[in-house]
Each structure stands twice: as C-alpha cells, then as structure tokens.
Amino acid sequence: MSYKYLVKRLEDSGYETYLVGGVLRDKLLGEKIHDIDLTTRARPEQIMKIFSDMKLIDIGKKFGTIKVIYKSEEFEITSFRAESLYKDKRHPDKISFSNTIEEDLKRRDFTINAMAERNGKIIDLFDGKKDLKNKIIRAVGNPYERIEEDYLRALRAVRFATVLDFEIEKNLKNAIKNKKNNIEEISKERIRDEIDKILLSKNPSRGIRLLENLDLLEYIFPEVKKMIGFNQHSSHHKFDLFEHSMKVLDMTPANLKTRMAGLFHDTGKIDTFFLDENGEGRFFGHQEISKEIIKNRLKELKYPKKFIENTLLLVERHMDNTNTYTKKSVRKLLRKVGDENIYDLFDLQKADVLSTVHDNTENILNAKKLLEEILNSNTPRKKDQIDFSGNDLIEIGFKEGKELGEILNEVYNLVMDEKLENKKSEIVKYIKNKYNNLDRNY
C-alpha cells in the first residue's frame, strides 16, 4: 500500500511513525478503508522537508497536520501532540508537541479512535479493541473533559454509533446531555458535515432518534422534533408524523437530497392540520409549508444553493403522485423538476407510499415507464431543442415584445406534449393558421 512508502521515509529519517485513528478502527472491523492518517514524532517542518519532492497541502500546520499527495492519494500526517485547553470548544489554545505516541493517544476523542499501529504491533492504551468488539462508543479518559474540549465530539459520537451500529456509553451520554448548550458554539458547516454522514448511513433514522435521545434534535432540526407524537388522525396513516417520517427516511436510497427531503417532506402538516366533517385529518398545501421550512433550515446550515433548490423541488412535488400519472403529466413534471431530480422524486414518493397503510406503488412504477418512453423518444425536453426561435417569429412578421415570449411558450408546450411536430415548417404553418386573422406581414 502507498502509505508504507511514506512511513518508510519518515522512519528512515529517524522519526517513529504510526497508523492511527479511523484507518486502524476500520481495519480491525474489516471495513473498507477510506482515509489513511499517520502520526509521527517528526514536527511539521520536518515532515515538509522529508516530502519536499511531493505535493504538500498545509491543512493545519499550526496544529501539526500536513497533507501529502502521493500517487494521486491523499495522506494526512500529524505530529505527536499533547493535551491542551480548548477555550473556543474547537481548537486547542496552544499546540504542545509530544515525543511519545502514548501522550498523543491520550488527547483523542473515543477509545475506538485512540489506537495506533507500528510494524504490525497495536498500541491500545484505552481498550479500544475491547470496545470495538462490544460495539461501544466510549470517551478517552473523562467524557466531560473530552466533550467540553470540542462539542462536535457529541455529533461524532452519534455519527459513529449510527454508522457502526454501536451504543454510546452511559457516562458519555450524560456528558453530551450535560453540555448540550455547547452545540450553539459549533460552526454550522461542521454540524452540517456530521449530519450528512448520519443521513447517508444504512440506518439514518437511528441517528435522528439518537439526537433526540441526547436532547440535541431541538438544536439541529427543531422542526423535526415538533413532529414527535403528532397524531395525523388519518385513515391513510398508521404512524404519527415523526414515525412516518422516520420510515420514509429509511426507505429512501442513500442520496443526500432525497433523504433530507424525506426527513422534512411533511413538516408543514402541523401548521396545515384540521379535521374535516368526518373527523379525518387534512393537510391541504402542506408541501408548500414544508418547502419553506426546509429552505430556512438548509440555509441556516449553509448548504449549497443548488442542493437547496433541488431538495425543495422534491418536497414541493412529493404529492404529485396522488393523481394518476399520464404521459402528459410526467412530461410536465419533468419540465418542473428536471432530469437530475425526477428519479429522486419517484424514490421519495415510493418511500412515502410504503410508509402509509397502502403499499401500492403501481402509479409510480407506471410513471417510471412513461418517463423511459419520453427519455427514449425524440421529443424535445428543453427549449433550446425546439426547431424554432424568437428570430423565426420576427422573420415572419412578429415584433419583439411580450407576445413573442407567449407564442414561443405555446409552441414549446405543444411540441413537448407531442401535439405539434418539432419541425420549423410545421411550426410556421401552425402559427400562420392560428394568427392569420392578425395584420401580419408574412
């Protein structure tokens, strides 16, 4: 493996070097290894000198970390460090480098991440292997101190418990609850990154439930917390609003925008709820309210603009399948949400249906078939694919203005619905026939 060459260069230069953290954890679990982190007695300047012939990225030199690019792979190499105070709840006030791996491991967050390996020998000062075997997330040393140093560790604990299907140790749970207000001191971007990993896990609802169990859901997704225990009074639903949303979340594919939409798609039901004359719960227009709710939350968490736009489309259109899909309605939907979102929308709708008393997804399956027919046909799906333009209208006597755009939209919709052939001569013929009573200089 490529990292062995980096280790050899450091060792040959006189600096003991270890595999550390997540790579060792995943290796012991038999999981696929993604990121390889090394820790060494070499200081940042020495690391940079040893690898001066390679591409280096200073991602945190003052904190002792250098990223080395070797054979197109990225490796983070960090100098041994000692424990320090964390007044900003994120970074140590002062970086104290250490000369021993033992001192370095003491500062790490959880026992399963506080193991190191050198020459095939594992150093495990805090029984990390035992906690891996017993599926426990346990803090290194005093959990209150670890959480106080950097409260993001609370979300990391939830993420590891969710992704690995582990339990959070009781004292660590208590520390997280005790320091819960500290979450407000974490940057939105760091919170977002942990939430993404939770939502993309095999069992995302477990992560949401853990956040609630640890009193964190009200800080991160207060709109989701409001759904807990909300009775829908609906013959279509066997679960309360929260449980329904958890089912939807778990049934969606591991796609971030689809899962985020699944989590929030019904948050607007609380504000639109009323009982009809038969005592049945109604939520007219709840998708529009849900859309506004998730828009505000995603902006708060600093998600990219394009991601927000696409996720909003899924929430806004998740009720479209309540009407029987036709080729015309699928075309219209395709125009609304775009190629990049329509399959994700169908995935969301399917998960939504399967989380009710109904399990009939025939309408959605039919919509997918119709969509395939549309995509495989020569029918244009975008305006620039129409064999006609505003210049053509001007050439046959129309003047620039509002009317020009209205006629072009009319032509576009007719061609899209296969009611008019996408051929300039046919389009011109249609326009002349329709507008022949107007005083045009054709």
Region locations from a protein language model:
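Catalytic cores of the polymerase beta-like nucleotidyltransferase superfamily
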Residues: 1-442
